[in-house]
Swiss-Prot record:
This is Methylglyoxal synthase. It comes from Proteus mirabilis (strain HI4320). PANTHER family: METHYLGLYOXAL SYNTHASE. Keywords: Lyase. One of its GO terms (biological process) is methylglyoxal biosynthetic process. NCBIfam families: MGSA, PRK05234.1. GO terms for molecular function: methylglyoxal synthase activity. The active site is at 71 (proton donor/acceptor).
Length: 152
């Protein structure tokens, strides 16, 4: 599939997701970076969003809890180009009942070429990048062109 440019605005739409055993780590990371995150729009799965809002006061648009469809909601937003960055602290040592949703979420983030951090070290690298707070371009699939070709 051909690729086209997508511009990520200075103010990013950032999705925050964390498995149960990783929520405290994500919450600590958000607290440490709350000043910088306050300049962006935050979205999160249900429990994670509640915790972030309660402990930091940051405004967070909350989806359903991950196992109840929240991961899929975030994935749909990625496909609709409504999420620019995914911060997803997932637990590789414990299986979750909605593991197919987790895989689908990471797959969509890769398909749509958005920056993804799956642990604190990567999240630190990402948030410290100059691109985090400035307009930048990414390459994404040319879905409209793909459809045009397929429907000839």
């Amino acid at each position: 599939m051909e690729q086209i440019d997508r511009t990520l605005a200075t103010e990013k739409n950032i999705a925050l997701v964390a498995h149960d055993h990783c929520k405290s780590s994500l919450l600590e990371w958000v607290k440490n970076n709350s000043e910088q995150l306050s300049h962006h729009k935050l979205f999160a799965t249900g429990t994670t969003g509640n915790l972030v809002n309660h402990h930091t006061g940051l405004e967070v648009t909350q989806m359903l809890s991950g196992p109840m469809g929240g991961d899929q909601q975030i994935g749909a937003m990625i496909a609709e180009k409504k999420i620019d960055i995914l911060i997803f602290f997932w637990d590789p040592l414990n299986a979750v009942p909605h593991d197919p949703d987790v895989k689908a979420l990471l797959r969509l983030a890769t398909v749509w070429n958005i920056p993804v951090a799956t642990n604190r070290a990567t999240a630190n690298f990402l948030i410290s990048s100059p691109l985090f707070s400035q307009e930048s371009k990414i390459k994404i699939p040319d879905y409209e062109g793909y459809l045009k070709e397929r429907l000839k």
